[in-house]
């Protein structure tokens, strides 16, 4: 199993919160399917890999970016991540964490009417969650112009890359009035997997051109700090071009390789392969494995830098490169979309994250660094829950 911990070099304590969010979202789904009595033996629900690809993005938003007037539409399969964050913020009672997809319990898709914790937009059918904040922005502008007091704030959509196959998405993007809505920010979870396959020909550059042509600001978060550092070394330019030119299935296969296998496969057979070989042969095994996974959508600093570039005079799309299942033993596997961790894999993950499977719902100490960060946004969060 090759699953280095996420953001090993990220500043504490935000990285600890990120790890805890990954654990909580995974544990909720594990409990619903493997712990709670289930006479039928059928899968109850939940998508651990889809949650994992969103953990860094949502951690960086909730614990460093969002303000009280902001609203967020969360991609449907990332609902357990939202529940985990709300739990850490004190907005969800522990008793609900064992109720995912139970009658009267937590929903597997965010629901304003059924979930007990704060949800800005109900999402479910693909495409709806992406576009709903556009209509929310229009409604807020109308209320403010007519009655006043509607407040201000950005409208974020967290979008799975496969949702961009939906025609309704592009109907909204191309609407001329949307180009004037600077409060709209979409963050695309570009993990290049759809259902149980690796999408072979997904072209991020084409998506960038389509958004740009509609008048949107396009920000691409492709690589994390480790890879960016390696690119500055001898052989780094060749490594960068090799990764950029690599077909999606080949890249996904590298995620399931040992360090020695990565050293063998990664250089390829181009003229500058020897330069790549020399570069990665100087790295220890842990660094080799971390480097091949070091995409921008899992780098908290890279995401923070992207948010700082948002232009509030026009809509923005942030295309964040991610790995489906990042941090899990199943990361990058082409059939991990609806798969569940085995009990053994779950215990391995617990050990990697420093968690006790017998006490899965532990919060941070209130007076510790991570606990204080969780408490800081709470007053603003309570205010936004009751505002328009």
Where are the model-predicted features located?
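Conserved acidic/glycine
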Residues: 1-60, 163, 167-168, 185, ...
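Short internal beta-strands
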Residues: 71-75, 183-191
